[in-house]
């Protein structure tokens, strides 16, 4: 089965530094067709193991090799494909005035708790839609500092229970998964 692994909060402003090439080498010892995309912790791999086993193994590798304890989120290729099949219409419009993201909620956390922590969105500045324990979140580029969620995603206690990727990043990850399937 093909999995997408999202590492939360790595290689940002020199913190939680993980060299993706080194991590890839470690992962290749245990998993097949390992691929990384960007330096922000996007990994594609194949395994017959469960999400739980993969999560535990990757957490161990990261702790042993890089001496870090970071949250990770794992989803299957089919789950990511389903997310894109249910993307909101406002994102499909590709409005250049908005920055489009997907917030992945790391289990056991859930949407209701995340929403309660982040609070109500700033109308006319941001838009959200929940789908299957992810949140599509877009905000106006000109007014992003006025966005309630933009301020709170990095500063509230919920920050370790979510990982955020741009729609474009995840679209490319999905494409890489598809390309790798044809090889």
What is the predicted function of each stretch?
Residues 3-40, 44-183:
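Surface-exposed, charge/polar-rich loops and edge strands
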């Amino acid at each position: 089965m093909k999995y997408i692994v999202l590492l939360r909060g790595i290689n940002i402003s020199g913190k939680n530094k993980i060299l993706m090439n080194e991590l890839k080498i470690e992962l290749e010892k245990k998993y097949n067709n390992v691929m990384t995309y960007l330096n922000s912790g996007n990994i594609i791999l194949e395994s017959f193991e469960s999400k739980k086993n993969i999560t535990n193994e990757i957490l161990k590798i990261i702790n042993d090799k890089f001496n870090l304890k970071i949250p990770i989120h794992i989803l299957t290729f089919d789950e990511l494909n389903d997310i894109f099949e249910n993307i909101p219409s406002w994102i499909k419009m590709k409005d250049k005035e908005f920055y489009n993201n997907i917030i992945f909620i790391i289990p056991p956390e859930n949407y209701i708790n995340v929403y309660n922590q982040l609070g109500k969105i700033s109308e006319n500045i941001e838009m959200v839609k929940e789908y299957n324990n992810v949140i599509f979140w877009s905000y106006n580029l000109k007014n992003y500092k006025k966005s309630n969620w933009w301020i709170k995603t990095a500063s509230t206690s919920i920050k370790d229970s979510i990982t955020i990727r741009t729609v474009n990043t995840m679209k490319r990850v999905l494409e890489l998964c598809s390309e790798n399937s044809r090889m």
